[in-house]
């Protein structure tokens, strides 16, 4: 045994047929698994009779490497993923098995989405793929699957995806699982042979198993050793469920539970905070977790004015860490959703702080709404920009026919796109003046400030009406689309001229491309999902406000709390949490997780982002200037010295008053 504490040692030496090791963050679960394998081999078990299952190839490689470092003269058991094991089983029985690649599936869905909807963002493609996977992994147990996106869009993509695989004779990872279960159920000889071969099964991250993987373990099981933590179950969108751990004895009646006690990662007060937060959940084991390191770390909680001030404070703190000799890569900025990274990326580019985006394909400005608005802006600068013209000419629908656009695309003339369209024919007389007026309006955008130009596109050019029609057509919440619009407006806030903003967008894209291949020292930017299993000396959690953390689209508050818990437990020494008063110009409540963790008083006074001297716009009273902010009340002067007082929470939540500057 290698420096095991008594709880780890108990787990490693456990004689029970079926064992569940409940392993909180930083408790050394990988150490336990490696030493368990060594213990089995030292006690006469053949390596070929041991399989260790993980959820990622990198985790499997890490375990294999660590095993070899302590047992370099011993044959190595199987270390791999569930899918890797299923592949080996099926190849042995069926011969050749061809798997659809991740990139192939991604591009197939992206192409199909482009034919039926405007939203072909990375997030939307992944949502479709996740729903396809979830349907396939749950349909054996629940035939009433409801996708998280438009049912029409999902069913169309699902049909195309399955038809493509059938035509190409391809399987995906979910097919591997289903085919393996079917094979073992219907061929008892094969089942018996694998039961005799797989005498000892060890499972890492047991809480992440889906229903099919649990079924496989029950079918094949002779002796199972599972390590996991229901408090870190954050993949319900893939079919995982904390119930599998909480009710372990029901699934595996011979089961026994062992609790690892010490967190070897985080300082004492960080561990204590994480316990207070997660103890609010009901569907879990009660655990006695202690920090091995009894020293206190540094926990800070800030309520900045908005996302701009939040990103500025983070950049300043990271520079302080760097000046003290720390590496950038010792720091992570963590958020609930990818969209929240936009303001951080902007700030880091300006401050020349190197960063690495773990979700390499994300770029907020690639969302279809952003690309539409940008196309209008680009066309105002360059009226001959064909790509931008084609993108927006029917957004909203302006009755420009497919035939007219076909002729437009065929033309080799280099000229103003509106004039070219009118010269191509297939344009009805009643459309001519509308197209000419649209040309004038778009050219006039370049004479406006950026803010005015965006507002003109949204209102006068009826782009908001287009989004409402889009939401109705695809059964999507309009609020989700308006969130993108508001984030875009915030991104543009610091720019006065269109040309400067477009240059900034290009700069962001170039920096994101560089960050994909960035192996140099860089700050990590990631969603909580992306950093699960990782640890950092310094962790910043941003936008800890209700409707973001917990997210407004989630109806599972316990999973949202588990996500926050996972974020907190990534920190080794320094944890900083931010709850901006205002996001996208809207008043925000501090996250209930912050209040549960006693980081902030329930009696926090909110100023809604209002500051003395600010210009504001009231839907009722027009433009005004903030005179005073005191005890939840804002005083505003309108017109010719008309003074009015408002309850900040009321006007902010109702959206009655917005901040101009």
Predicted feature locations:
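Accessory C-terminal helicase-associated subdomains
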Residues: 423-534, 548-552, 572-578
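C-terminal accessory regions
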Residues: 507, 538, 544-642, 646, ...
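A basic/glycine-biased coupling hinge at the interface between accessory DNA-binding modules
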Residues: 17-18, 24-27, 38-184, 196, ...
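ATPase/helicase motor core of nucleic-acid motors
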Residues: 295-297, 326-448
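Conserved helicase core region in the C-terminal RecA-like lobe
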Residues: 78-86, 202-205, 227, 500-552, ...
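Short glycine-/polar-rich loops that comprise or flank the Walker A/P-loop
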Residues: 46-49, 222-223, 229-231, 252-257, ...
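Helicase P-loop NTPase motor core
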Residues: 20-33, 253-256, 262-355, 380-382, ...
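Conserved helicase NTPase motor core
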Residues: 2-13, 17-22, 59, 78, ...
């Amino acid at each position: 045994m290698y420096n095991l504490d008594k709880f780890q040692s108990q787990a490693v030496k456990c004689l029970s047929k079926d064992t569940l090791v409940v392993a909180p963050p930083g408790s050394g679960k990988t150490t336990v698994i490696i030493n368990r394998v060594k213990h089995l081999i030292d006690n006469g078990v053949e390596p070929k009779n041991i399989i260790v299952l993980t959820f990622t190839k990198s985790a499997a490689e890490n375990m294999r490497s660590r095993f070899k470092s302590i047992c370099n003269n011993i044959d190595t058991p199987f270390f791999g993923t569930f899918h890797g094991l299923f592949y080996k089983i099926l190849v042995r029985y069926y011969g050749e098995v061809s798997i659809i690649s991740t990139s192939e599936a991604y591009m197939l869905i992206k192409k199909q989405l482009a034919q039926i909807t405007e939203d072909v963002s990375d997030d939307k493609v992944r949502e479709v793929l996740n729903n396809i996977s979830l349907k396939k992994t749950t349909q054996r147990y629940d035939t009433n699957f409801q996708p998280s996106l438009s049912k029409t869009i999902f069913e169309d993509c699902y049909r195309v995806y399955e038809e493509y695989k059938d035509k190409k004779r391809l399987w995906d990872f979910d097919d591997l699982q289903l085919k393996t279960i079917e094979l073992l159920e219907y061929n008892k000889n094969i089942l018996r042979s694998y039961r005799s071969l797989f005498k000892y099964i060890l499972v890492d991250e047991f809480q992440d198993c889906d229903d099919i993987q649990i079924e496989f373990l029950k079918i094949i099981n002779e002796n199972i050793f599972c390590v996991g933590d229901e408090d870190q179950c954050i993949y319900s969108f893939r079919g995982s469920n904390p119930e599998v751990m909480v009710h372990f004895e029901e699934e595996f009646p011979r089961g026994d539970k062992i609790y690892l006690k010490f967190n070897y990662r985080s300082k004492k007060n960080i561990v204590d905070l994480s316990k207070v937060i997660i103890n609010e959940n009901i569907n879990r084991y009660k655990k006695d977790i202690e920090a091995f390191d009894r020293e206190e770390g540094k926990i800070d909680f800030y309520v900045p004015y908005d996302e701009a001030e939040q990103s500025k404070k983070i950049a300043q703190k990271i520079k302080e860490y760097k000046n003290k000799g720390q590496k950038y890569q010792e720091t992570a900025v963590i958020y609930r959703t990818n969209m929240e990274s936009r303001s951080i990326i902007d700030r880091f580019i300006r401050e020349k702080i190197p960063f690495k985006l773990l979700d390499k394909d994300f770029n907020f400005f690639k969302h279809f709404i952003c690309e539409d608005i940008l196309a209008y802006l680009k066309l105002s600068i360059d009226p001959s920009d064909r790509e931008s013209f084609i993108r927006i000419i029917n957004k909203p629908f302006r009755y420009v026919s497919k035939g007219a656009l076909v002729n437009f695309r065929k033309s080799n003339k280099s000229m103003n796109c509106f004039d070219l369209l009118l010269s191509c024919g297939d344009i009805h007389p009643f459309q001519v003046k509308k197209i000419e007026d649209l040309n004038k309006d778009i050219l006039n955008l370049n004479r406006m400030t950026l803010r005015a130009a965006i507002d003109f596109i949204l209102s006068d050019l009826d782009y908001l009406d287009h989004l409402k029609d889009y939401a109705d057509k695809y059964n999507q919440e309009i609020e989700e689309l308006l969130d993108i619009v508001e984030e875009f407006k915030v991104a543009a806030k610091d720019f006065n001229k269109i040309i400067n903003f477009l240059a900034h967008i290009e700069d962001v894209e170039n920096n994101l491309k560089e960050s994909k291949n960035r192996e140099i020292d860089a700050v990590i930017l990631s969603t909580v999902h992306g950093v699960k299993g990782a640890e950092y000396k310094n962790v910043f959690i941003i936008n800890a406000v209700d409707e973001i953390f917990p997210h407004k689209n989630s109806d599972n508050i316990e999973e949202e709390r588990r996500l926050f818990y996972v974020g907190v437990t990534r920190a080794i020494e320094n944890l900083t949490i931010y709850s901006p008063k205002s996001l996208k110009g809207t008043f925000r409540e501090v996250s209930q997780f912050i209040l549960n963790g006693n980081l902030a008083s329930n009696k926090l006074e909110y100023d809604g982002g209002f500051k003395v001297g600010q210009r504001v716009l009231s839907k009722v009273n027009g433009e005004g200037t903030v005179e005073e902010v005191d005890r939840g009340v804002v005083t505003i002067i309108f017109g010719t010295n008309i003074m009015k007082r408002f309850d900040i929470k009321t006007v902010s939540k109702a959206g009655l008053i917005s901040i101009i500057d």
